Structure formats: structure tokens, C-alpha cells
């Protein structure tokens, strides 16, 4: 009986220790492709900063056996050598945008003047269709917070060019040599617009490509 009790206690302690280790151990060695094999990720966007590469991706939590997707949050992974990676847990969730109802779709992060701006695709809460929001952080790994309190681009801003509700997706950002920043996005119809230096406002009309 004593041996059985010892075995149960040992097993419980080992299980608890293993769970704690797995929870705290966020660094792993990539073993071929896909790089991230312990969870489902989608729509990766990469950024290089201070000798490290960062990958920002949506986290697909759809439970089996459903054959769809469930994206409520984004992940960020960093690597100094493209082999050893570290996950920095939950830098941003779709619900961090009070005006959004969910769906953490494709996104892109860029650095400017020591701040990191994350342009994301979400479903708007009151304006039907996909919208683009922007979050900001002092660190490439977050945490990030809504930089505006409202969407940067909404579906009703582009109905002149297409009637679909999901054309305002997949944002990316480019800063030209003269310092002018541009936002690019689209689906079936592509768009671009200049950004103000604060990186959270459009600086001119939306131009179809």
C-alpha cells in the first residue's frame, strides 16, 4: 500500500513538473518545414529587426473534426539564426480591438522611430465586412494595443471598386527611402494609400491598383 501511494505521488509530481516545463519552455529548434509544428498557424508575416527575424501569424484553434478555421489571436516567434525559435505568448488578440468582433486574419508588423506598428485584418463589429486595424507596441514581441480606437480601413471605404465584403484584407506596409510610408492591401482588387508619419492615419485617397 505504501509503495502504491509513493507511486501515485511520484506520478502526480512528474506530471505537474512536465506541465510546468511545457508551459514555460517557449524555445524550440525548427525541424524542417513547417517551422512551427506544435500548433496551427496561418498567414505569416516576417520582419527583421536588430539581427533577429520575427514571424507574426494567426493562431488557428479550430477543434477537430471540424474542417474550417478559428482564429482569435496572433502569435509571434523570433529567431537569431532561422533555426532556434522562441514563441512570445499572445502579443495581440482580435478582441483587443473594441470595434472588432473577431477573426484574426493576415497581418504585418513594421518598425518606425522605435515603435512597432501591427496592421491586421479583422471582422468589424458594426460595419459589415473585413476591416484593417493597427496596433502599436514599444517591443516587437508586444504586448500590442489598439493604436486608434477605430478601424483604419473599413469595407464601406472601397465599395466603389468591388462589392465583396472581404476585399480589405492582407495589409502590408512599406517605408520608402524618403520616409513616406504606404499601406497596401486587397483581395480580387488591390489598393494602396499613403500613411501619415504617425503611421495610424491615411494621408490621402485610397488608390486602386
Task: Mark where each language-model region is.
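Carbohydrate-active catalytic/glycan-binding domains of CAZyme proteins
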Residues: 22-209
Amino acid at each position: 500500500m505504501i509503495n502504491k501511494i509513493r507511486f501515485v505521488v511520484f506520478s502526480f509530481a512528474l506530471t505537474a513538473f512536465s506541465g510546468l516545463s511545457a508551459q514555460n519552455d517557449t524555445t524550440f529548434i525548427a525541424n524542417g518545414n513547417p517551422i512551427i509544428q506544435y500548433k496551427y498557424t496561418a498567414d505569416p508575416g516576417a520582419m527583421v529587426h536588430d539581427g533577429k527575424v520575427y514571424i507574426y501569424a494567426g493562431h488557428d484553434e479550430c477543434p477537430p473534426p471540424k474542417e474550417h478555421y478559428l482564429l482569435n489571436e496572433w502569435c509571434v516567434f523570433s529567431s537569431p539564426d532561422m533555426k532556434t525559435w522562441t514563441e512570445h505568448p499572445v502579443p495581440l488578440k482580435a478582441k483587443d480591438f473594441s470595434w472588432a468582433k473577431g477573426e484574426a486574419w493576415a497581418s504585418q508588423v513594421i518598425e518606425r522611430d522605435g515603435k512597432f506598428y501591427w496592421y491586421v485584418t479583422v471582422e468589424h463589429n458594426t460595419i459589415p465586412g473585413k476591416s484593417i486595424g493597427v496596433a502599436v507596441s514599444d517591443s516587437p514581441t508586444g504586448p500590442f494595443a489598439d493604436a486608434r480606437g477605430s478601424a483604419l480601413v473599413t469595407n464601406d471605404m472601397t465599395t466603389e471598386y468591388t462589392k465583396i465584403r472581404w476585399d480589405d484584407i492582407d495589409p502590408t506596409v512599406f517605408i520608402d527611402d524618403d520616409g513616406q510610408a504606404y499601406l497596401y492591401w486587397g483581395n480580387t482588387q488591390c489598393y494602396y494609400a499613403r500613411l501619415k508619419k504617425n503611421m495610424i492615419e491615411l494621408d490621402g485617397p485610397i488608390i486602386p491598383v
